[in-house]
UniProtKB/Swiss-Prot annotation:
Pfam families: G-patch_2 (PF12656). Keywords: mRNA processing, mRNA splicing, Nucleus, Spliceosome. Belongs to the SPP2 family. It comes from the Eukaryota. This is Pre-mRNA-splicing factor SPP2. Associated with the spliceosome. It comes from Eremothecium gossypii (strain ATCC 10895 / CBS 109.51 / FGSC 9923 / NRRL Y-1056). GO terms for biological process: mRNA splicing, via spliceosome. Involved in spliceosome maturation and the first step of pre-mRNA splicing. Residues 1-37, 68-121 are annotated as: Disordered.
Length: 207
């Protein structure tokens, strides 16, 4: 049988001599400073900013023509920070102080009379559309128009007949689309024939 033996006595610690690490002499120099261990205390860290590359701009050569771009007025220029000094140049814009001083104000006796309720009662809101059409040249004969439309049936958009081919805008067709032989009534379309002008000039010169 095999047994296990336990020794509870503490073994004395063997102190190993720490050998000093020497820096290897790569270049075979006689004197080499030993590497010193030093502590570096970091108090603050500054953000590293990379230098921005300057953008190359192509400046066109000055031409003899005048610029069509209107110059900027003083009010349209960008805001300037700091003390703004007056250069004494004329901006070409009317001064706002002129309106404050009363220039261009119409006297009260020359103002038009205000519109009262009597004027609104003469033309009610319901008749405003008819009044507008009368101002555009309409004679106001609604009875004749209604009489012409009494016998007609209201045609829905999907029931409307198609327009004839090659018919201009606003032109009326002479072909009755309701008839079955409507296509026979339409005359054949004659396309434009290209004429060679060189042959025509040669024929004219020979004659």
């Amino acid at each position: 049988m095999s047994g296990i033996s336990l020794n509870l006595k503490r073994k004395p610690k063997v102190k190993k001599k720490e050998e000093e690490r020497k820096r290897k002499n790569v270049f075979n120099e006689d004197e080499v400073d030993p590497q010193k261990r030093s502590k570096i205390l970091i108090t603050e860290v500054n953000a590293h900013e990379a230098a921005k590359a300057k953008r190359r701009v192509i400046v066109p050569a000055c031409s003899g023509r005048a610029s069509i771009v209107p110059p900027k007025f003083a009010s349209e220029q960008g805001p300037s920070y700091g003390l703004t000094e007056s250069t004494g140049e004329q901006t070409g814009r009317p001064d706002k102080s002129a309106a404050k001083s009363g220039a261009g104000v119409v006297p009260l006796d020359q103002l038009p009379d205000p519109t009262g309720l009597e004027e609104y009662s003469e033309v009610p809101v319901e008749e405003f559309g008819a009044a507008l059409l009368r101002g555009m040249g309409w004679d106001g004969d609604e009875e004749e128009i209604e009489g012409d439309r009494r016998g007609q049936k209201t045609v829905l958009p999907h029931e409307q007949a198609g327009r004839a081919e090659y018919l201009g805008i606003g032109a009326s067709s002479d072909v009755d689309r309701s008839r079955k032989d409507a296509r026979l009534q339409i005359e054949e379309f004659m396309p434009v024939v290209k004429v060679d002008r060189a042959k025509d000039t040669a024929a004219d010169s020979s004659t």
